[in-house]
């Protein structure tokens, strides 16, 4: 099983509480290869979604209470980047934070090229464009 995560730069994630890191640990704990990339590293090639990605290995972690984890200072290692076809992954997680910019929108359009019957994309790119959690509040200015 190979799972790709489209995330923000790893150095900006807080591994003690970040849910993307928690999902990576859960995947690795179940024997999956964890691959990481960023939105601007996705591309469409001959109608397929491809990413420049790195295989990630996570240092062990353990629960610390208050929904946090105790992690090593060097909480991951990664391989050299290589091109991978995202439709050959077992699943792809879209896990980036704002801004919702051109790279983000383009990444969701590229992820649309993946057949969800073959490779699930979590969070659905169409849903992210139609109802982004980062922009949804703008629809309710009175709140």
Segments from the language model and where they lie:
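Extended, domain-scale alpha-helical bundle/helix-rich regions
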Residues: 7-8
């Amino acid at each position: 099983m190979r799972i790709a995560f489209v995330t923000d730069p790893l150095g900006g994630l807080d591994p003690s509480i970040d849910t993307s890191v928690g999902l990576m640990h859960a995947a690795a704990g179940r024997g999956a290869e964890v691959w990481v990339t960023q939105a601007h590293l996705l591309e469409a090639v001959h109608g397929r979604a491809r990413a420049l990605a790195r295989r990630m290995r996570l240092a062990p972690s353990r629960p610390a209470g208050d929904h946090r984890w105790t992690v090593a200072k060097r909480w991951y290692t990664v391989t050299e980047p290589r091109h991978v076809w995202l439709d050959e992954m077992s699943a792809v997680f879209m896990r980036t934070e704002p801004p919702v910019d051109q790279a983000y929108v383009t990444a969701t359009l590229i992820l649309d090229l993946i057949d969800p019957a073959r490779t699930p994309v979590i969070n659905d790119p169409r849903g992210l464009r139609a109802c982004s959690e980062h922009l949804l509040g703008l629809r309710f200015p009175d709140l």
